[in-house]
Structures are given as structure tokens and as C-alpha cells.
Amino acid sequence: MSIQVENIRKAFGDFVALNDISLNFPGGELVALLGPSGCGKTTLLRIIAGLEQADAGRVLLDGQDASATHVRERQVGFVFQHYALFRHMTVFDNVAFGLRMKPRRERPSEAEIARKVHALLDLVQLDWLADRLPAQLSGGQRQRIALARALAVEPRVLLLDEPFGALDAKVRKELRRWLRKLHDELHITSLFVTHDQEEALEVADRVVLMNHGKVEQIGSPAEVYSQPASAFVYGFLGSANRIRGVSATGAVAVGGQTLAADHQLPHGQPVEAFIRPHELAILPEHGAGLPARVQRVLTLGGLSRIELEGRDELAGQSFDAELPADAPLLAELAVGQAVRLQARAARVFAADPQGGEA
């Protein structure tokens, strides 16, 4: 089922949560609503579900205006961050709950309910836990049961609000791979809210990146990462060194040095250059580049992160560089050592005159 939101606006007092949002989600997609806390992503999800009413605008499900349709009539499955399982019910009864609550004329027989519940528990690979209580399950198992319960009523749309946010990093990684595989089997239109950039980029077909109640960019994970539409998008999607400077011909002047720019901006315009840690080369102090000093070297699995501080005109500016953990250069670096930095690539945006993100 397709979903469209048209000119949605929602405010809570003086706080504008959603400011004229229009989006189109084709049927069968798995879409991430990504952004920092307070950007409006959960409010948008709740409006689509019918759990919140928009102040203005429309929600269309398969082309039909559902703005005034009660949440029960929208045929939406909703999965919350904190499971929301009934503690006194077994896993089986939790999954069966929605089916048993249907109006009598629509309610399946107990035999049909049992068949369907066991099929769903088999789908989420937890049929062997059917007689357990939620307290006897791990966090990851509870979330899979919550998803099975949402699917039991055969929703036309599946909405997930930070479904893995309460889980530890290892379990989150396992579950997002599982969710992607499950979606590929079911092909149900699904939207999930997350503030985890890696989660959105790894799982989604498309990413909607939001900030301050507005949409910053929509695209595939590869598009939003490699072709960011704004400084906010670049800075939010992964680690980045951020340097203020002035545009020159095909370059950016920073601290008496020049960095090659990825595109032209008017000469002399204040700009911000963004450089990924793996695109920052560390050179001997007598070479050309940005003056810096090594502050710390950390080895994190197969990568080493070098934390540096700017010198001279860049005093007070922090930088991060990344190298393979077996890079020969690491043996030559010492805390306090003066070095030079050169960017292999830099993404340049016009600087926000207010000092924020452009």
C-alpha cells in the first residue's frame, strides 16, 4: 500500500514539530525516517498511524484520504521501542491478542488463530518460546514478538518507532539484518524511525532525513551519503571534520592553506569544508598542509583513530583521522608530535551566517 502525506503541519504550543511536510512512499518500500531528537520523525509516524492528528494537511493511504479515519480502520501495525507486551500473557497470547479483539463477525476461530500465531512465531524464529512469559525473554526476543503481534492482524502498513533503540549494539546489528530479510520476504510497506545513521543506511531502501520539522533530503542510502544536499546532512551521516574558511578558485582557503573543493562557490564567500576522517592524510611537520598536533591514538578493531588539535591559526580546532590498524605510519606517531594534515577530498557548503548548519 502506498502512503502520501500532503502539507502536514503539527505544533505543540509554540513548538512546530512538522512544518509543511509532503512525502510519497510507494508500496512495498522499507523507508527510514532519520534525524536527531526533536526533528519530528516520531510525530510524523504517529500522524500516519492515526495516533496523532495533524493541525493541517492530509494523509492518503492507497490514494484515499485517511486523515479522519480512526486508527483501527487504517489497518496499520505499530511497533514501539519498548515492546509494549502484556506481561501476564504468554508469547502465544500476546501475538493472538489483536486477532481475538476483532469484532465477532471478523474474528477467526481459535483453531485459525492458533495456526496463524504459530506461523508468525515460526516466521520470527521463536515458535519454541510460545508458552513463555515476556519476562523470560531477552530484549531482542521481545522485540521480535512485538513485531509478530503487529503482523498478526495483517496490516497494510508496518510502522516502527525506534524498534531497536532499547537494545545493546550487538543485538541491534543482528535484528536490523533480520528485519531487512523479513521485509524482503513480506514486501509490506514499512516506515521505521531511527536516530542511528548506520541503522538507516544499512536497512532502508530510502532514507528521509529530517531536521527541525522539515525534510532535508530524500534518497537511497548511497545517495544521501555520497551526495548530501546540505551541511546538516553531511555532518549527520557519519563522522566529519568541519573547518570554516573562504572560497577561492576551485579551492577553500583555511588557516593559510588551501583545500581542493568539490564544486565552485562565489570567490571570497564564507564556507564550511567537511572532511571524513578516512580522507584526512597525516604528513610530516615540514610538509604542506594544515598544522596540527597528535593528541591521542586509539585502536578500535581493524581501525585506528588519531585525535589531533590544530596549531597556529587553527588552534582550538579538533580533527579526527582514521587509518588501518596495521598502517606503518602509526608506529611513527607520538602524542604531542607536530604534523600536517591534507584532505584527499572535501565537501564544501556555504557557511550559515548565524554560525549554525547551512
UniProtKB/Swiss-Prot annotation:
Molecular function in Gene Ontology = ABC-type sulfate transporter activity; ABC-type thiosulfate transporter activity; ATP binding; ATP hydrolysis activity
What EC number(s) does this enzyme carry? 7.3.2.3
Q: State where ATP binds.
A: 35-42
Q: Which residues form the ABC transporter domain?
A: 3-237
Recorded topology in the membrane? Peripheral membrane protein
Query: Mind listing the UniProt keywords for this protein, alphabetically?
Result: ATP-binding, Cell inner membrane, Cell membrane, Membrane, Nucleotide-binding, Sulfate transport, Translocase, Transport
Reactions catalysed, semicolon-separated, are: sulfate(out) + ATP + H2O = sulfate(in) + ADP + phosphate + H(+); thiosulfate(out) + ATP + H2O = thiosulfate(in) + ADP + phosphate + H(+)
- Where does the record place it? Cell inner membrane
Gene Ontology CC: ATP-binding cassette (ABC) transporter complex
Q: In the UniProt record, does the keyword ATP-binding occur?
A: yes
Q: Which CDD domains match?
A: ABC_CysA_sulfate_importer
> EC top class, in one word?
translocase
Q: Does the keyword Cell wall biogenesis/degradation apply?
A: no
Spell out the Pfam families in the cross-references: ABC_tran, TOBE_3
Gene3D superfamilies annotated for this entry? Answer: P-loop containing nucleotide triphosphate hydrolases
Q: Which SMART domains match?
A: AAA
Q: How does it assemble?
A: The complex is composed of two ATP-binding proteins (CysA), two transmembrane proteins (CysT and CysW) and a solute-binding protein (CysP).
> Entry's NCBIfam families?
3a0106s01
Query: What PANTHER family does the annotation carry?
Result: SPERMIDINE/PUTRESCINE IMPORT ATP-BINDING PROTEIN POTA, SPERMIDINE_PUTRESCINE IMPORT ATP-BINDING PROTEIN POTA
Family classification: Belongs to the ABC transporter superfamily. Sulfate/tungstate importer (TC 3.A.1.6) family.
What is the recorded function of this protein according to its Swiss-Prot or TrEMBL entry?
Answer: Part of the ABC transporter complex CysAWTP involved in sulfate/thiosulfate import. Responsible for energy coupling to the transport system.
The name of this protein is Sulfate/thiosulfate import ATP-binding protein CysA 1
Organism of origin: Chromobacterium violaceum (strain ATCC 12472 / DSM 30191 / JCM 1249 / CCUG 213 / NBRC 12614 / NCIMB 9131 / NCTC 9757 / MK)
Gene of origin?
cysA1
